[in-house]
Amino acid sequence: MTLFEKILAARGLTTRAAREEFLHPNYASVKHDPFLLPDMRKAVDRLKKAHAEGEKIVIYGDYDIDGLSATAILLDAFGKFGFKEVGAFIPNRFVEGYGMTMGAVDKVRNMGADLIVTVDTGSLCHAEIEYASSLGIDTVVTDHHNVAETPPPSVAAVNPKFPGHKYPFRDLCGAGVAFKLVQALQTELAGLPDGYEKWLLDLVALGTVCDIVTLADENRANVYWGLEVLKKQRRPGLKALMSVAGIDPEKVNARHLGFGLGPRMNAAGRLETAQYALDMLTASDRLEALEASEKLEELNIKRRSIQDEIFDEACQQADNMTDDRVLVVNSGNWNHGVIGIVASKLVEKYKKPVFIIGERGDEATGSARSFGDFSAADAVRAADDIIIKGGGHGAAAGVTLATERIDDFRRRVNEFYDSLQLKNQELYLLPRADVEIDDFSEIDEELIDNLAKMEPFGNGNAEPILKITEATVLSVRRMGAEGQHVKLTLRDKNDVALQMLAFNAPEEFFREVGDEVSAWFQPTVNEWQGMKSVEGRLLHVSGV
């Protein structure tokens, strides 16, 4: 077996048919009947009425990339279907906050809405939808988030998380559900012939990758073909944003969406308003697209600077909490839109669960990131009598509490951690190799070309990781303005050498020449001044 075949086998792809299906996703074979989703029939019927009567539709999106992508999908498709009046409302994180709110419903009423179509939100907005109804505004919900025992009082609630339906795949993102609505409308309205909906897959791919849903079944095919659509550069906004981000459209992959386009789009909603990102997605000409993209780039640079400041301040606090098993850091000067990213970076550095809390007068709001067997949501529940509200899931949660109760909250979540008597939690943060190797003989361009066939990478299909079980450190080079990056050259048992690079490397990566080590890495190709070289993206290193 070749190394590539071993990697495929490690992913459970042991037969020729399974490999073929995985490496060449078939859009048609996973284009499941949209009418199997709950309430899709009701949603289509209500939209047909709006179409026939020329009603004003307002698409109510979320300010994250999934919500923005879903909003852009419906704006594009509804235009082609010939809906007479269609607008969009994206809430501001710092004004309306997350989800539907009463104030936001008032703003939508002032836009003249007869019908609200939510995307990526709405399943838990019972009171707000009831309020809209009292104002004479119907609501069609399209969403993918968790649901309550009773559906919202909307005309329709299309969400694969609702029980009792026969749709075969439940892990669609908001953009994916919006796309299913488009597919359903195609069967009943003219304007977007069968097959032409595939030109929307660039937006579906963007939402799917950035919302970190499982890249399997329909999601994998949508992203696979969505990347092909992106390469065609039919959307001026995404073409301009790729240019600003330095992404070659012919080589665009899922990593570029998650780490190139995604952060730039998110910066708008984190610092000012996500409307800038929607303006980019819906730009109709090159100049408009470039202006919107440059605005996103400017905000992203500002976001990075703010993020670095918060991280440094949080580290100063965390350095004085060496005995705490859960880090709870807080300040009145931290931007609420950025603290979630900082929480993730603190977990990486300190290898502990983290709550980062921004104070706003008497009330404070925080984000949590965790790992392993310590559930952030369970920790919030353990402090239920201390907080105002909170929730989430194992890896991430949010919490709102009185500022004066932060110290009590810190004590409570640490007591909760101790009560669990957890062991070896840090092991969950270590990379897990798909295959172990004892030499570098197959680490070449052919392998990297083959690994690219496994794209798109993301949740449920991570980039393959290899572990060299024993190698000798030939050289160590510190890089970067502060020596924060490292380039190791490792030699295998056959005297074959491979360079490995790690950015912002922890101190244990800086080994001594002659050390015998094991290393976890991802093979990559480095292109510099027209020259190609195979190297490794170093993820972890330990003594043999």
List PLM regions with ranges.
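Histidine/acidic-residue-rich, glycine-tolerant segments that coordinate divalent metal ions
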Residues: 112, 119-172
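Short beta-strand micro-motifs in enzyme catalytic cores
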Residues: 364, 397, 484-488, 532-534
